[in-house]
Structures are given as C-alpha cells and as structure tokens.
Amino acid sequence: FLSLIPHAINAVGVHAKHF
C-alpha cells in the first residue's frame, strides 16, 4: 500500500504539470 502513495503523488504531479 505504501508503494501506491508515491505513485499517486507522482500521478498528481504529472497531471498538474500537464496543465
């Protein structure tokens, strides 16, 4: 589960960078 946390944060970072 802890491995999903950095993945989610990275996804949010990529999503924010996209906009």
UniProtKB/Swiss-Prot annotation:
Tissues expressing the protein: Expressed by the skin glands.
Amino-acid biosynthesis in keyword set: no
Chief location: secreted
Highest taxon in the source lineage: Eukaryota
One Gene Ontology term from the biological process aspect of the record: defense response
Phenylalanine amide PTM sites in chain numbering: F19
One Gene Ontology cellular component: extracellular region
Subcellular location: Secreted
Coiled coil: none
Family: Belongs to the frog skin active peptide (FSAP) family. Phylloseptin subfamily.
Function: Has antimicrobial activity.
Name this polypeptide is given: Phylloseptin-Az5
Organism lineage string: Eukaryota, Metazoa, Chordata, Craniata, Vertebrata
